[in-house]
Regions:
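The feature captures the conserved acid-bearing segment of alpha/beta-hydrolase catalytic domains
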Residues: 360-420
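C-terminal catalytic histidine-bearing segment of alpha/beta-hydrolase fold enzymes
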Residues: 356, 408-411, 415-451
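Hydrophobic h-region of N-terminal signal peptides that target proteins for export
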Residues: 9-18
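Short beta-strand element of the alpha/beta-hydrolase
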Residues: 201-205, 212-223
Length: 451
């Protein structure tokens, strides 16, 4: 015990002397080409690994150090390897793809005992000093796996007609927090909608805004699983536009305690007595037996109704109508881009629900499966890559982040949504970015666009 205490004390002294902590040490990666998807089938793809974040190594990570890496690809090939690395000199691995598609590389820094530095919590789900990145070859030739329903457009035309039959009526309750008084008016809004729940959310309107003076944007939330809590007014919202932060579920925003939201979540997720059992909402194949009754159907109705309401606001300039959101919010953003008349700009981030029919999930490599949403014919009506085909030329789309290491919303599907768009579109490729993590600069990024 005394030896262990002395060892810990020695490390503490070393850290204090150097000013370097283990959590500051980063393993990063980049490809030899600036554009990491600018490779040909069969061409050598080189990944360069390097250490960053410190000027000298912390006491817990003295050389010799190694990188243990695993390469997976849409070609079904998995390769593992180990390379030595130092702070002064990185290391590299080379690979290639035999088919148009994506390569993913997972790498971990280890010491001379070949154990990861598991005291470092890199993200909520990842321990160690590691990096997950990717590259692509002839990705423009990848084929969408989702089989487009023959009645896709008729399905959504019918949905719009159902929604149009419900008058656009709303009630607002002012909920402006002290920090925004004098700058913005904030309202808890509830808008009549087709389906079991209204469209609800936080509406922000700049103080003293004049008629027809402002653009309007709907912002959409990510997937919250079983975390249903009392809604809070967002901390930061642009003060030069109208913003509706739409709640994904349509529950009431004010006037309830934690139990109301817990009960709602229990019902949605199959925990409440009598509720259909499921892991979490929208993730069971049986949810899509009737696509007109699935959770996403009513969520999409609320997305469209949000814009019906925004268009009625006297402060809206009548021209600029936008959408933004990440993950599930990115999926909703793409629904809006494909379904809402008059949308002028869409900014999805790490878009969920692209290429839901991915054939690679059946006995093949799993690197390109979108997380959660089942491979079910009824789910294909909600595929973001199919809605991407319907975005009009009058709407400009900016995919603000495409994580090359994203497992939940993998780059293959998001790229397929990009290639399906005929409108002006760009996408920022971020090396080492997983679903909820972006490496600090310097880091490899590259923006692709069709304009």
């Amino acid at each position: 015990m005394m030896k262990r205490l002395l060892s810990m004390a020695a490390i503490a002294v070393a850290v204090a002397a150097s000013g370097t902590e283990l959590k500051d040490l980063k393993l990063k990666a980049k490809t030899d080409k600036a554009n990491p998807i600018d490779y040909k089938v069969g061409e050598t793809i080189r990944f360069d690994f390097f250490l960053d974040g410190v000027t000298e190594l912390p006491a817990e990570a003295k050389e010799p150090l190694y990188v243990i890496w695993k390469r997976e690809g849409d070609d079904g090939i998995t390769v593992v390897g180990t390379n030595g690395i130092s702070l002064a000199k990185g290391c590299s691995m080379e690979t290639s793809l035999s088919v148009p598609g994506i390569i993913r590389v997972d790498a971990q820094l280890v010491g001379n005992d070949y154990k990861i530095f598991d005291s470092v919590q890199r993200t909520r789900n990842d321990k160690g000093i590691g990096v997950r990145g990717g590259a692509g070859a002839e990705t423009e030739k990848m084929k969408l796996s989702t089989k487009e329903p023959e009645d896709f457009d008729a399905f959504w035309a019918e949905a719009k007609a159902k929604l149009a039959a419900i008058p656009v009526k709303a009630k607002r309750i002012e909920a402006t927090p002290d920090r925004l008084k004098g700058k913005m008016k904030v309202y808890a809004v509830e808008i009549d909608c087709f389906g079991p729940r209204p469209a609800t959310g936080w509406l922000f309107i700049p103080e003293n805004a004049k008629e027809k003076s402002l653009s309007a944007c709907a912002q959409f939330d990510g997937y919250n699983g079983n975390e249903f809590k009392v809604p809070q007014v967002p901390e930061w919202i642009p003060t030069n536009r109208i913003t509706l932060c739409l709640n994904a579920h349509g529950y009431e925003m004010v006037g309830h305690d934690e139990q109301y939201y817990k009960d709602y979540g229990d019902k949605v997720n199959g925990v409440a007595p009598g509720a259909p059992k499921r892991m979490m909402y929208a993730l069971e194949p049986s949810d899509y037996d009737n696509p007109r009754e699935t959770y996403f159907y009513y969520m999409a109705m609320r997305v469209m109704r949000a814009y019906d309401y925004l268009k009625t606001l006297p402060e809206w300039d009548g021209k600029n109508l936008e959408a933004s959101g990440g993950s599930q919010g990115g999926l909703q953003t793409m629904w809006a881009a494909g379904l809402v008349d008059g949308l002028t700009a869409a900014r999805p981030e790490v878009t969920w629900g692209c290429d839901l029919g991915n054939s690679l999930r059946e006995g093949g490599p799993l690197i390109s499966n979108t997380w959660g949403i089942p491979h079910a014919d009824g789910a294909f009506y909600f595929d973001a890559a199919l809605h991407a085909k319907r975005v009009p030329a009058t709407c400009k789309v900016e995919i603000t982040r495409l994580g090359l290491g994203d497992l939940a919303c993998p780059p293959r599907g998001v790229l397929l949504s990009y290639y399906n768009m005929k409108c002006p579109v760009s996408a920022k490729l971020v090396q080492g970015s997983t679903h909820g993590y972006v490496p600090p600069a310097p880091n490899q990024t590259f923006t692709i666009s069709n304009y």
